[in-house]
Amino acid sequence: MSADHSRDPCPIVILNDFGGAFAMGAIGGVVWHGIKGFRNSPLGERGSGAMSAIKARAPVLGGNFGVWGGLFSTFDCAVKAVRKREDPWNAIIAGFFTGGALAVRGGWRHTRNSSITCACLLGVIEGVGLMFQRYAAWQAKPMAPPLPEAPSSQPLQA
């Protein structure tokens, strides 16, 4: 079985996913904590309250997203290397390991519940992705041209 050379090697994919997840978390954190800081500040200080909330919390949220994305990508590459196939089960298994690894400090019960929850979440995401792929393939299915009408047996009138 030959390796798939159309994709970047796993270390580059891991760094790319970490950076993308960090950016998503940071942008989402700017929006979320900006609104939250604006609403929780007194009337004359709403702008500065929003900015201080953004500066304090948005990088933290970006880092949390980045850790999740990098860890998921690491486990995804590891599962692909072990299973030697590319299918939706890789993401589900990687989600299971990611949820467990992030929750391991909370004890056995928390680790188990987070692993199962993360695997279920990734299962739903993969299922929706497969559903959209099948729908797009069905939309692109070639259709036969319409059949011409059968000639009528009535003579033409002049």
From Swiss-Prot:
It comes from the Eukaryota. Changing residue 4 to R: Induces abolition of mitochondrial import of transit peptide-containing proteins. Disulfide bonds join 10-77. GO terms for molecular function: protein transmembrane transporter activity. It is a multi-pass membrane protein. Residues 1-11, 76-87, 134-158 are mitochondrial intermembrane. Keywords: Disulfide bond, Membrane, Mitochondrion, Mitochondrion inner membrane, Protein transport, Translocation, Transmembrane, Transmembrane helix, Transport. The disulfide bond is required for stabilization of the TIM23 complex. The chain crosses the membrane at residues 12-32, 59-75, 88-108, 113-133. It is found in: Mitochondrion inner membrane. InterPro entries: Tim17. One of its GO terms (cellular component) is TIM23 mitochondrial import inner membrane translocase complex. GO terms for biological process: intracellular protein transport; mitochondrial genome maintenance; protein import into mitochondrial matrix; protein insertion into mitochondrial inner membrane. Residues 33-58, 109-112 are mitochondrial matrix. Belongs to the Tim17/Tim22/Tim23 family. Essential component of the TIM23 complex, a complex that mediates the translocation of transit peptide-containing proteins across the mitochondrial inner membrane. Present with 1210 molecules/cell in log phase SD medium. Component of the TIM23 complex, at least composed of TIM23, TIM17, TIM50 and TIM21. The complex interacts with the TIM44 component of the PAM complex. PANTHER family: AT05822P-RELATED, MITOCHONDRIAL IMPORT INNER MEMBRANE TRANSLOCASE SUBUNIT TIM-17. This is Mitochondrial import inner membrane translocase subunit TIM17. The lineage of its organism: Eukaryota, Fungi, Dikarya, Ascomycota, Saccharomycotina.
